[in-house]
């Protein structure tokens, strides 16, 4: 007999993880609101971050895959939640390392984010 997965519970947990990540991103971006021109908006679990040079970073959830996707000027990244962090499925780097680097490049300013 095949075991049925409780996808509702898994999806609820996924939404909690995504919400938590998006809130942390917002908090970190808000730390720099007086230093650099960064605008962001969130609609239907898609966060669009616009820098003063009009470059974008887009972060969105991929519910069927249980992933977070990050699109930057440099590349696109897919993250799975492993060991209490979002890990890139190609480089094994954590989300914050890649996101912080992309924001620093696209804003032309060294940004350091608090990940807690």
Curated annotation (Swiss-Prot):
Protein name: Iron-sulfur cluster assembly protein CyaY
Entry keyword set: Iron, Metal-binding
One Pfam family recorded for the sequence: Frataxin_Cyay
GO MF annotation, one: ferric iron binding
Similarity section: Belongs to the frataxin family.
InterPro entries per UniProt: CyaY, Frataxin/CyaY, Frataxin/CyaY_sf, Frataxin_CS
GO cellular component: cytosol
Function: Involved in iron-sulfur (Fe-S) cluster assembly. May act as a regulator of Fe-S biogenesis.
Taxonomy, superkingdom: Bacteria
Keyword Metal-binding: yes
Gene Ontology biological process terms in this record: iron-sulfur cluster assembly
């Amino acid at each position: 007999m095949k075991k049925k997965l409780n996808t509702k519970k898994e999806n609820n947990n996924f939404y909690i993880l995504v919400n938590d990540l998006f809130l942390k991103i917002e908090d970190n971006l808000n730390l720099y609101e007086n230093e650099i021109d960064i605008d962001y908006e969130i609609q239907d679990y898609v966060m669009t971050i616009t820098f003063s040079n009009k470059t974008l970073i887009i972060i969105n959830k991929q519910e069927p895959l249980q992933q977070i996707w990050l699109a930057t000027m440099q590349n696109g990244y897919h993250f799975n939640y492993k060991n209490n962090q979002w890990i890139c499925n190609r480089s094994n780097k954590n989300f914050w390392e890649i996101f912080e680097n992309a924001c620093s490049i696209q804003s032309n300013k060294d940004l350091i984010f608090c990940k807690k």
